[in-house]
Amino acid sequence: MHQMQAGPGMFLYAHDVPQAVAIRGKERLLTACGKNVTDSKHYCCKECQIADWKPHKGVCKSKYLKESYAPGWVVENRIPAFMAGPPLAMFGSLQYFWGNIPALDLLKVKDNEGEEAIMQRDVALLFAASGDLRNVIKTIIGLPESYAGNCTVVVNDLNTAIVARNAMLLLTALHFEPEVAAPIMLHLWYSAMLPQAILQALQDGILPYIHDVCNKIKDKPTDSMQAKTFEIGGSSVRLMLKKREWVGLATMFKVPEGLRAPEAQSIRRSVTMTRVDHIDRHIYKMSPGRRAGAIDFRQHGVLLPFGASRKDFAMPNP
């Protein structure tokens, strides 16, 4: 068997099959379960097909992939929980790691100043109570590629955990080459589990910056504000935190002692897989494929193409 990279016109399906491959075209492909349909999962050979049958069987026969899918309260002929409870009920932790609306481009250069007019102008942006970085990133990449001005962005938030993750993401973008930084940022941002290689890259590449600051401010008052500017390749990130927040940031590069993958997933699923009536209401109008993908992400919390191997994602995201 030969390994190939998936691309346009290719099919890839591999849970934990180490050598599962994708082949262009359909004439040599084997379907997973004899279903001769366009969106069926395909394999390069019988060996891969057999090796992947056990995980595929559960997916293929999933109720979420059926056009006839109905919410649990319909199947069981009962009143859904959200109809019987209070109009507003708090649930889960009070952490808001992701925003609940799509990213916004605050500048929309083409619709306002215009690309030519802004090309040499300096831009200063404030994202107060920013939450995650989606609006920051959407706005920055909206600038023309040949933009030659200085762009200064100030980002703050009251939530220390959000600020810490934003700092890790920005330092990752600053330190690593784009093709290395992109997958690290993606999974640090959205995946509940990480490969050891990503954790190691963060610990080797970014954590020394934080340790250096912590060593220099060790004698400062706990609640004193301390700032450090990191400069690489003409870009810079200035991070201003309280001393205790710098110390806390350093701990976020390592998995908490004693927390293993099964326990981390159990804690996560106690939130993501409960309140089934609310979940059913959310996914009911989705297409079968999107519905199955949404449930898969709720169960495993790894942002990968549906069916891609999660084998290397064995470390809890700190």
PLM regions with names:
Residues 1-37, 42-144, 158-165, 173, ...:
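N-terminal charged/capping segments associated with class I S-adenosyl-L-methionine
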Residues 122, 144-318:
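Class I S-adenosyl-L-methionine-dependent methyltransferase module
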